[in-house]
């Protein structure tokens, strides 16, 4: 039977000082050494709408842990708002913050000998950073996120009512046909509430994937941040972490440990969900990183195999269905992630040998929570009726609206069955070829099928800023392939997101007639023929460093290939001319010591852009 980890600091005369400090921090003396210490990793910050409401959430979770028989000790991590950091030097810090968050959780848990962990995450790098930490620590852990934002609604000058999200505010801002007054109305209404941005962007994608992996409760990825139903989710998560902590330490039940939940089969299921729902390409980066922390051999080849057999069952903003745009509130109304998993299960596309923090098996999980399975629990039906309040609010639990009816239409609704899939090809794909020997990724759910095969001349940019300038100066034309290089994990450093270039292409009317390729990455809000994570990156001598203006590039999504149409002899000549120096030309960029440290250890995107400490020698 494993001893409580906290016994190290709660037992023995020589730990009198540690116990004195615990008493000073509010722990009742009678509880010290008798109850498990549950670390509450909160990520509250006033910088990020996805986290601005989390301060009271930490208290709710801590109080529920106390009531369930644990000792809750809350601390905070940092949280970068990618939307605010976007388009300037601040974005260099976003991806490196993932590893910093993972380290900070590890530091706090190990320094204080916590017995278990509950992670209150939400936005882009916070959930994956905490996931990496949980798998690294391998102590009983439950995830519970802050929840999605409601979609926006703006009444324009001409009386037209538009549904909106953050990406609309960015792309419309460069559309000369939209008036300043309408831009202001769009800006004021695109992000109406607290929560992670309303589409299937990176934050919501990752929170949904924690459900599929088995480390969070049903509804974690889809119950709106503003809804009162989310309070019950926080309390249930708190009770669950105390329960699995007891099962491990009192019953020697190792099945509750993160590495025994997040198995290879669980990662495959999560990737199947990701592809079916057309999640952010960033999720691939983060799942690769998490798998390494879990010791699970899971790479781009496995992801490519899954992508070839799983269809696209949901198109959620920024991906657009033919008749309408769906948001996370629509996914929730359709039964949330259990409904998507249920459709995949009925199509024979999920591994059965998985379990979760809340259910002993996949079949038990879906029987209880899938509203389309025929016998969902009353609690499930109640949960999926939680609807948007359509009132501006930055407060959690500020509304309790309910849908009159659920969307159970598997033929034409938000979530489709495999038989009625949006496309037989899934929403994400891995491409390989001489331009990306180790692979690159594209969100096919966001690409118009008319350009799934594409060939055009390269327009080379040594930075995201150069690409933005060329787009805004109208130097990019229909048929071009914009190549942005030296923006990878090492070359950036920090692997910036490219939401502005893709949004500006869309705003200029080039979203369906141009391609963009980069060794950087894209926001979850990106759509169009946007191919990222080209590996090896330019700074590591990848072929993308050899591309010249006018070179023809061919993209073939159905056949999963991407090629620079330049013969090998010429590429060899160009490589020799660089003389081993792979660096951007005429780019001035301030790089801090913190970023240089990240770059010194960073791996390419095909390895998850994780740090490789062996590079330190």
Curated annotation (Swiss-Prot):
One of its GO terms (cellular component) is cytosol. The active site is at 523 (proton acceptor). It holds the Pfam family ILV_EDD_C. One of its GO terms (molecular function) is dihydroxy-acid dehydratase activity. InterPro entries: Dihydro-acid_dehy_C, DihydroxyA_deHydtase, DiOHA_6PGluconate_deHydtase_CS, ILV_EDD_C, ILV_EDD_N, IlvD/EDD_N. It catalyses: (2R)-2,3-dihydroxy-3-methylbutanoate = 3-methyl-2-oxobutanoate + H2O; (2R,3R)-2,3-dihydroxy-3-methylpentanoate = (S)-3-methyl-2-oxopentanoate + H2O. This is Dihydroxy-acid dehydratase. The lineage of its organism: Bacteria, Bacillati, Actinomycetota, Actinomycetes, Kitasatosporales.
